[in-house]
Amino acid sequence: RFEPWMALSFSEGSIGGDIERVRPEALAAFYENQPLSQWDQGTGARSAIRAVASQGEALGLPSASVGSNGFAISPLKSESGNALLLINPHTSFYFRHEAHVKSDEGLNAYGASTWGQFFVYQGFNETAGWMHTSSAVDNIDEFEETIVRQEDGLFYRYGDELRPVEQKTVTVRLRQDDGTFTVERYPTYRTHHGPIVRAEGDRWVAVALMEEPRKALIQSYARTKAKNLDEFLEIMESHTNSSNNTVFADAAGNIAYLHSNFVPKRRSDLDYLNPVDGSDPSTDWQGLHTIEESPNSINPPTGWVQNTNNWPYSAAGTEHSPRQKDYPPYMDSGSENARGIHALALLEPMSAVDLDGLVTLAYDEALPAFDELLPPLFTAFADLPGDAPAKARLAPAIAQLEAWDRRYAIDSVATAVAIFWGDALRDAVRDEARANRWNMLTVMAEAAPAVQLKALEDALARLETGFGTWETPWGEINRFQRLSGAIDLRYDDSAPSLPVAFTSSFWGSLAAFGAAPRNGTQRWYGNRGNSFVAVVEFGEKVRARAITAGGLSRIPGDRHFDDQAERYAVGDLREVYFYPDAIAAHSLGTYRPGEPRP
């Protein structure tokens, strides 16, 4: 059942709110007085809340579920002279619900809402559109507090002061298996830096983050009514869009990349990715950076902006983006990623594009990560002695990869071999990359020749075991399937499914499809990545095309349970009916919530 406070617990709409950066295991260990041995070794003792989308991608984590793409095209590069917008969040399937929300007081927004929220998070109205991408901004910090226990209570050291630790008891009702409720009470602690979330040796650790849920909720809703860029920027003065960047376009022809607009000012000589000394007042936040102080790109001469969870320093290409040297290091802790490289390769040479062309860009088949990864493999194979047993075994697969255009396709054997090999190579070097926090693609490309070749042997063996032959087309492996409306879906190789060509964003696929064998299957089934996708043109009237993974109903057998699946699998976006006459012409009927559906 919905309760009003729930909206305040998740007020900005992203994949995970800022509070999700706090690790529950460490939180539980602190409040249950359990040892934190797992956090006291190696990188485990580093900041528990710095994992952001682009860093996870660099480390080779399952990135297809935590990425997003946004492109905005100005009249300079639009065939129609109208601004265009690509809205392409990568989330868990069915986590974004497509809706058109109207009121008699000026609300008229279309797009995707996150479960449990009442505002359109990524979408458009009649004259403006917004796409949010997870940011690598460093705006969540940890402060190590020196705790002093005295007879009259708990204190923490701050400069020459001893300040009291704020203590509060939180009461939580817990539902039992039989439907009854029990009441549990938990003590909580906080300092002026924020709540205590874990311990680091004998110090307590407070987390500092954006704690303005009411303002964040107002900003999230108000921006859906913004008519143009000026109104959108005015709403951003709330500074509560903390974990996301924005790609924007409007009917006046404006486009913009807008960096996360919650960026605390702090010392640039300290590494805030690690906990800092909370007893030193000079480590404190010193207010927030203004919008003008952020690495935005507004109406650049390129005629386009893009963000793929990469850094802001390529938002408008190599010549016209913000310059990294002009900003403190905490302004963005990410880097370029494979999707960003892919986007730049498409946008920089582009002369002009229309709405259909924007769809083509969004589903471009190139996998640029393999441009970096495959040459070292080819060298390793070429250096094998002619009489080496592996030479004959691997030669046919190497020939497939050498002839491959490095573009995905459902009938491509090379796509399957490359991805299986890439997965095996990533597994082989994962621990080294994580331990040193090195870029995963770089570590893979620099792996020893023997490691490269062993990964290919492992990939071919896995293909033969799972599918009978290593020469299996990618579409026989990579599938879309929806059998129920459950949140935790089950998959079945014997049940109907659809081939999907696009793949993990780790390889640079702009259209992302996070697939893997699941619950004992041989085939790979996607459950994250492209969820809601839309392209929008802002002319005298707004035009849009969109697609949602599977369908909008969660009820198997309902006409809308999987009616979009075939279109989704091939990137065939349908027309959006935005205006009343179009809605009336295509409606099956009307009803109010609680009434039987037509």
What do these predicted regions represent?
Residues 1-96, 104-106, 111-119, 424, ...:
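Substrate-recognition/specificity elements adjacent to catalytic centers across diverse enzyme folds
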